Every structure is written in structure tokens, then in C-alpha cells.
Regions:
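Surface-exposed polar/charged interaction patches
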Residues: 20, 69, 76, 100, ...
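Charged, amphipathic alpha-helical oligomerization/scaffolding segments
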Residues: 50, 54-61, 65, 89-103, ...
Length: 162
């Protein structure tokens, strides 16, 4: 949409009606690109912060308790395969989160090397993809991790309990 605002036919129309000049349209487009980049940058840095300071530590606590549960159940002579399977699954999500968080931090740092339209496109094409890659294992873990460990309200709590 921003890109279309500076197309020759759009510029001609706005200039023809005396609404905006080409320079004004280009200036407005640059401002919109900058605002978009700033918004995505804030969202990405917030995701990195939430993952690193809240979600990953919570999952580490949960997997530690789950591992202790597996050992206790085995010591009691019972089958701990379900707990062990959950531990393996959640540990896998934890590993994915750690890698995705590092990748997101790297892409955010790289985004700072661009400006204007190029930066906005980098945020759209690269940073948002990295954000989705972090969100995927977090969403999966949220469905499994005990709510006593989860640091934020779940989607269902937000949807049905507010």
C-alpha cells in the first residue's frame, strides 16, 4: 500500500487534484516505512525479552519438575513413559525457542543496517519470519506446560475468562 502511494499514476492523480505533490507523497511514504519498521522492531525486541526472561526460564522450571517426576515414578516401579514423552517434547520446544530467539536477535541487529524502504522490507521479509519461527514452538509449549509455570495468561484464559 505504501509502495502504491508513490507510483506515477498515483502521483499524477494527487497532483492533478492539488492534494499532494510528488515530494510530499514520497515524504509521507518514508514516514510510513519508518513507522512500520519501528513498530516491528519494538515487537521483535519484546518477543526476545519475553522469551529470554519469562518463557524459557518457566519452561526450564517445568522440565526440571517433570524430570524429577519421571525419576520418582520410575523409583516407585511404575511406568513413567508418558511423563518422559512430555519431557522430551517440551525439551524439544525449548531447544527450538532458544535457537529461534537467537536468530531473531540476529535479524533485528541486521535490520539496523538498513534505512527507509529497504529496512521496512527487511522487517517484513526477514524479521517477521523470524518472529513467526519463535512464536511456533512457544505456542506449542503453551498447550503442554502446566499453567502454574506459564508466566502469562493463556489464549483461552484471555478469550473466555476476561
Amino acid at each position: 500500500c505504501i509502495r502504491d502511494s508513490v507510483k506515477p499514476e498515483t502521483v499524477k492523480m494527487f497532483e492533478g487534484f492539488g492534494v499532494f505533490t510528488e515530494a510530499e507523497l514520497k515524504s509521507r511514504a518514508e514516514i510510513k516505512y519508518e513507522a512500520y519498521s519501528k513498530a516491528i522492531n519494538i515487537e521483535a525486541k519484546t518477543m526476545i525479552d519475553m522469551a529470554g526472561k519469562e518463557i524459557i526460564p518457566a519452561i526450564i522450571s517445568y522440565t526440571t519438575e517433570l524430570a524429577n517426576s519421571v525419576l520418582s515414578v520410575k523409583e516407585a516401579g511404575a511406568d513413567a513413559s508418558v511423563q518422559a514423552d512430555i519431557l522430551t517434547e517440551v525439551s524439544g520446544y525449548l531447544k527450538e525457542m532458544k535457537a529461534a530467539s537467537a536468530k531473531l536477535a540476529e535479524t533485528v541487529a541486521t535490520a539496523a543496517t538498513f534505512e527507509g524502504k529497504a529496512q521496512a522490507e527487511y522487517f517484513r521479509d526477514t524479521v517477521k519470519v523470524a518472529m513467526d519461527e519463535l512464536r511456533a514452538p512457544v505456542d506449542k509449549a503453551e498447550m503442554i506446560v502446566d499453567k502454574e509455570f506459564w508466566p502469562f495468561p493463556s489464549y483461552s484464559e484471555l478469550l473466555f475468562e476476561v
